[in-house]
Swiss-Prot record:
It comes from Mycobacterium phage D29. InterPro entries: DNA_helicase_DnaB-like_C, P-loop_NTPase. GO terms for molecular function: ATP binding; DNA helicase activity; single-stranded DNA 3'-5' DNA exonuclease activity. GO terms for biological process: DNA replication. Pfam families: DnaB_C. This is Gene 65 protein.
Length: 232
């Protein structure tokens, strides 16, 4: 299981959506944080390089170019747009996917985990339910053989998203269960693309740096949702 954490507006949803679309692996995406119009518009921009303004207009007017529509159709991704899904609803969606395709998806995305309704929870600790949810998603990954990615927030000092976020910067300190935790922050010099910096702050299977100061820098053009290596 992988946890991807960042401040609001940093680009964590764009990062994971671009990964799902470009990998072209069978994906079930629980998009609790964004509606269908937003996700389709983002997807059009990611695949075409169009500006978000152009993509949203094309989606609204149902005038997406045929070549782009065909590209979208060929990507094996299904979305669930429940704004606050329960664990039962997540299980039902997975069972329906398995019944339809006779297999579980290679990738499951939960965007984001704070939108999931859990029955466990302590009135004095709003994040106790999230700890249980991590156990649940971890077990889901084991049972389905899927890569499960959960998106999550960070603590107040890192909400600006302009500096490296350590493992301790995860909201609710729920990094115990996931095998991998990535944190994202963005840097801009005011000219050209932003740098979307990805820190591996936990990795049971390889190198990590809990401080977040060791990161991979990706080129991020927010207007067109393009995320690439700088030397692409």
């Amino acid at each position: 299981m992988v946890l991807v954490c960042a401040g609001p507006g940093t680009g964590k949803s764009a990062f994971v959506l671009a990964y799902a679309l470009k990998s072209k692996v069978p994906t079930l995406y629980f998009s609790a944080d964004s509606d269908a119009f937003t996700q389709i518009s983002r997807s059009v921009s990611i695949l075409s390089g169009w500006s978000l303004e152009r993509s949203t207009r094309a989606v609204r007017e149902q005038s997406i170019e045929e070549s782009i529509a065909n590209d979208l159709d060929e990507i094996p991704i299904r979305f669930n747009y429940k704004a606050s899904p329960s664990l039962d609803e997540i299980e039902n969606a997975l069972a329906a996917y398995d019944a339809l395709y006779e297999d579980f998806p290679a990738l499951i995305v939960v965007d984001n985990i704070t939108n999931v309704r859990t029955e466990s929870g302590d009135g004095d600790d709003p994040f106790s339910g999230l700890e249980s949810l991590m156990d649940y998603l971890h077990e889901m990954a084991r049972e389905t053989g899927s890569c499960v990615i959960g998106l999550h927030h960070v603590t107040g000092p890192y909400n600006d998203g302009d500096k490296a976020i350590p493992l301790g910067g995860i909201k609710g300190q729920i990094g115990r269960v996931p095998e991998m935790v990535l944190t994202l922050h963005r840097e801009s010099d005011g000219f050209g693309p932003d740098s979307l910096n990805v820190s591996t702050v936990k990795n049971r299977g390889g190198k990590s740096d809990p401080s977040g100061n060791d990161y991979a820098a990706l080129e991020f053009i927010g207007d067109t949702m393009q995320i690439n290596d700088f030397d692409h």
